[in-house]
Amino acid sequence: MTSPATLVLIPARMAATRLPGKPLLDIAGLPMVVQVLRRAQAAEIGRVAVATDAPEIAAAVTAHGGEVVMTRADHPSGSDRIFEALQTLDPDRKIETVINLQGDFPTIRPEQIGAVLEPLADPAVDIATLAAEIHTEEEATNPNVVKVIGSPLAADRLRALYFTRATAPWGDGPRYHHIGLYGYRRAALERFVALPPSPLELREKLEQLRALEAGMRIDVGIVDTVPRGVDTPADLETARRVLGG
């Protein structure tokens, strides 16, 4: 059910080295960023907007009926970009929850977007995110696959203790592939962007470690599959096959 207190923001930039102009690449007849926008709208959890510094992206989104907020080009991270967008779109501070949905997840399912809200039902949780169980050794050992190590709270919920590119945790038992979709309480996002980059964040190159090092609580919803991000030409062709039927 759509909530006026929830805002889904999709940060999108043109500066992709491996796939130039990535947000505007065609997938099944629509620009990639519009495919993501459509999935966010179908989730029906709140207002949806694309945050970008690129006029070309803004034009494509508005041409397909989407909402756009223009942001500065010099943001160090997507979190800083969505914070600027939040301030622009909601100066009266009516929004309580902000979803940060990456613009290169064209195959994400609407119900997965909605699932990131569930951990925030606990008022002790500052930030929510998602993960799926790892089933192959290749995935477990790939440094481009971020693993979340957490303490189980329920069959489908972890409290995050650490995120790493290493193969972890050691020993028998499940390992989890982190999915880069975040739900922030507004106060948590405000606190997060005010913090300096942390030592472990810089070492692992994982922004979410800044929150953990500052003592913020991140809970993780467990879902059944990892939506395919699009970072390479091969990823793009896979997304085109999936969405092209």
Curated annotation (Swiss-Prot):
Q: Which GO terms describe its molecular function?
A: 3-deoxy-manno-octulosonate cytidylyltransferase activity
Q: Which GO terms describe its biological process?
A: CMP-keto-3-deoxy-D-manno-octulosonic acid biosynthetic process; lipopolysaccharide biosynthetic process
Which Pfam family, any one of them, does this sequence belong to?
Answer: CTP_transf_3
Of the GO CC terms on this record, one is: cytosol
To which pathway does this protein belong? Nucleotide-sugar biosynthesis; CMP-3-deoxy-D-manno-octulosonate biosynthesis; CMP-3-deoxy-D-manno-octulosonate from 3-deoxy-D-manno-octulosonate and CTP: step 1/1; Bacterial outer membrane biogenesis; lipopolysaccharide biosynthesis
Keywords for the protein's UniProt record, in alphabetical order: Cytoplasm, Lipopolysaccharide biosynthesis, Nucleotidyltransferase, Transferase
Any idea where this protein resides?
A: Cytoplasm
EC number(s): the record gives: 2.7.7.38
User: Is this entry keyworded Nucleotidyltransferase?
Assistant: yes
Q: Which InterPro entries match?
A: Cytidylyl_trans (IPR003329), KdsB (IPR004528), Nucleotide-diphossugar_trans (IPR029044)
Q: Say which enzyme class the record assigns.
A: transferase
Q: Which cysteines are joined by disulfide bonds?
A: none
Q: Tell me yes or no: is Cytoplasm among this UniProt entry's keywords.
A: yes
Q: Which reaction does it catalyse?
A: 3-deoxy-alpha-D-manno-oct-2-ulosonate + CTP = CMP-3-deoxy-beta-D-manno-octulosonate + diphosphate
Q: Which domain of life is it from?
A: Bacteria
Question: Function, please?
Answer: Activates KDO (a required 8-carbon sugar) for incorporation into bacterial lipopolysaccharide in Gram-negative bacteria.
Q: Which family does it belong to?
A: Belongs to the KdsB family.
Q: What is this protein called?
A: 3-deoxy-manno-octulosonate cytidylyltransferase
